[in-house]
Amino acid sequence: WSTIVKLTICPTLKSMAKKCEGSIATMIKKKCDK
């Protein structure tokens, strides 16, 4: 993912991932950590 996408979308996705459990949360974290 581009840096801009990471900086803007990933904080939102990570906050959502905290509410989610399982594979979806893991997938978001993996994509945002790259």
UniProtKB/Swiss-Prot annotation:
Localization in the cell: Secreted; Target cell membrane
Tissue: Expressed by the venom gland.
Domain of life of the organism encoding this protein: Eukaryota
SUPFAM superfamilies to which the protein is assigned, alphabetical: Ectatomin subunits
GO MF assignments: calcium channel regulator activity; monoatomic ion channel activity; toxin activity
Record-level GO cellular component terms: extracellular region; membrane; other organism cell membrane
Record-stated family: Belongs to the ectatomin family. Ectatomin-Et subfamily.
Record protein name field: Omega/M-ectatotoxin-Et1a subunit B
Organism encoding this protein: Ectatomma tuberculatum
